[in-house]
Amino acid sequence: MQTTYSKFFLAGRTVHQITFDPATFTEADLLWLPHHEQLSSAGRKRKADHLAGRIAAFHALNRQTLPGIGTSGEPLWPAGVCGSISHSGSLAVAICQKKSLVGIDCEAIIAENEARDIQDGVVDTQEAQRLPQEAQRLAESGLPFELAFTLAFSAKESLFKALFPQVQTWMGFESARVTALTSDTLTLTLTCPLPPFVQNQAFTLHWCRIDAQVITLICDA
């Protein structure tokens, strides 16, 4: 599969990036992964996405090793390392560091009409538990609706990736709310306890835009 490696900085952290052409993927490419047999029943797109993400992770791990696949599909990082992987379209990103919360997500900016169709399943329009309406916060940001909505979607994905190693349970979009959104950061607040994390605990994420993609990152050293 044709790939190109690069890196950039977000929130002072190095993000490792792979751009790839899924059309050039072959089954033989997958043999590079020690766990390739676990992907034998996956579709072609899933295999290409997974491979690109693991290549990004390989660079994040100083080209020393590759994360395997956990029972819930999560990456298995080396002992003492926390990391995160994401892919969207022809872009894959990965980041890792020692013993901290870390979660990254990349998403293609969702078209406005589609965003409005699905917004009720992602953001809340009702006030609850003394937290402001998410829809109101997105509007107050001054960002175009489709960008603000995609950031909310992506940020929740990043947060859930970061919390999962400790929470070890499924989290819905309603588990966290956007309580602030600026030109480069976003704050999410938990709407319920997710032990060891508590209700109303807030997390700050950083974001950037690369062409038609957004990348959100939580990286709590």
Where are these regions (language model features)?
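Core catalytic alpha/beta fold that binds nucleotide/phospho-ligands
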Residues: 1-221
